[in-house]
Amino acid sequence: LLSVASAVADDLLPSADGQGISIAVEGSPANVYGVKRLLYEIVYNLCDNAIKYNRQGGSVKISTVSEGGFSTVTVSDTGIGIAPEYQNRIFERFFRVDKSHSKSSGGTGLGLSIVKHAVQYHHGKIELTSAPGNGTSITVSFPAIQ
């Protein structure tokens, strides 16, 4: 997952820089059995949203770790956050919290739905922590390679 996270950060750096947002990768190797392209899509879509819904001068951090039988990747941002009443719906197809913002930032409303299905395909789970005005942190955990 660390190499996937680094590739995503490299690919999204121009977009992040263009919006005045820093993007960083940290952690240790976290290996999983999986389809590399789908793992890339998971991290890419999470980071793309973290950039889109961030603030000028904000940051996105991608962290990887392997512990307790799981390999995890966490994408954290300093963005606008997600209100509690929307948090259980953001992985639905075409659901958008802020339709006015999504029109200006582009996208189809499918990115997080793709994440959900790709994580399920790999027998993983998703956890979200967010509060309006305080950013969002999404952790995806997969069974680790023993």
Identify the function of each model-found stretch:
Residues 123-124:
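Conserved glycine-rich
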Residues 57-69:
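Short beta-strand/loop element within the Bergerat-fold HATPase_c
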Residues 15-25:
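Short conserved segments within the C-terminal catalytic ATPase subdomain
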Residues 1-13, 64:
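A conserved beta-strand-to-alpha-helix junction within the catalytic ATP-binding
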Residues 82-96, 116:
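Short conserved segment of the HATPase_c
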Residues 27, 31-37:
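Conserved micro-motifs of the catalytic ATP-binding
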Residues 77:
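Acidic ATP/Mg2+-coordinating residue in the GHKL
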